[in-house]
Each structure stands twice: as structure tokens, then as C-alpha cells.
Amino acid sequence: MERAKEAILREVKKLRRETESDFAGLGLLDPASRRVTWRIVVGSVSSRTPNMTQRPSVGLLGMAIRSGTPVCFDPSRPGAERARTEDPILLAEGLAAAVFLPVRTGSDTAGVLLLGRRLTKDYTDAEIARAVRGTRALGAQEEWWRELSAEAAGWPKR
């Protein structure tokens, strides 16, 4: 099981580096508990982040899951500060710019990749396109997700 987690971690680190992000996190969607749990984090400044769970129907994370498309946190939009303070990851990590990308395995959403920056520098279309290609490649590795799902079954429910 560690093989799958290590491979996914390697890909998340690669996407963080290629998009010049300060933070990258992979939240896994658990249909049984109806929560997203942040199990893989890179560049975290908060010890709370790996233990956080979120409802997959709320906020920017929920919009990405429901729409199946990337959702950007744009600090210049009206209501942006409220969106930021209502999202525990954006708040805990001090992210000023972020993009939430759904990770699909087949026809199911397995999780969400969050890329973020602590300085206000919006993601370009090219960076988002690169991240989308990366999430598609992650989702295509079905054996990784099977191993990770088996491991997640033993995780505590929150």
C-alpha cells in the first residue's frame, strides 16, 4: 500500500513544483463518511492540515467536485475574503491564491487536488492546464486508487 501513496506523493510534489505553488494537497473523497480528508500535503505550514476534513458540498472545494472542473480562488472578486475565511485549508495555510482541481477515476470523483500560493499571484491558464493534465494522469492510475482506498478503509472516521 505504501507504494501507491509514495507514487501519488511524487506526482503531487511534481505538480507543486511545475505550477510554482507553495502548497499542494490531495483531499480524498470518502463516500461513506461524506467527507474529504487531506491525506497528502506538501509545503504545509500548519500541523492541522493533514487532520482536517471538509464536507464535499461546501465552498470552493464543493464547487470543484460538483462541477467536475477547476475552481480558482480569486482574491480580487467580491466575497473573496469570506470564501477564504470559510475554507479551513486556505485559512490554515495562509493561501492568497489557489485552485481546486477534481481528480476523477473513471466516472467517479476520487478526490481534489488543491494548489496554492501564499503570495497574491493568480494561476495562469497555462498553469491550470498543466495541473488539469496532472490530475488526469493521477486519476488514470486506477491501481494506485484501489490501494489507497483499501488503506483509507482503516483510517479513523471523523
Stretches found by the model and what they are:
Residues 26-48:
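GAF sensory/regulatory domain recognition
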Residues 107-117:
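Sensory beta-strand/linker motifs that couple input domains to effectors
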Residues 97-104:
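A short, aliphatic-rich beta-strand micro-motif
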Residues 3-26:
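Amphipathic alpha-helical coiled-coil segments that mediate homodimerization
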Residues 23-25, 87, 100, 112:
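Short hydrophobic/aromatic beta-strand element in the GNAT-like acyltransferase core
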Residues 5, 117-158:
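Juxtadomain coupling helices with adjacent low-complexity linkers
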Residues 45-81:
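Regulatory sensory and allosteric helical modules in signal-transduction proteins
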Residues 76-95:
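Signal-transducing coupling segments at domain and membrane junctions
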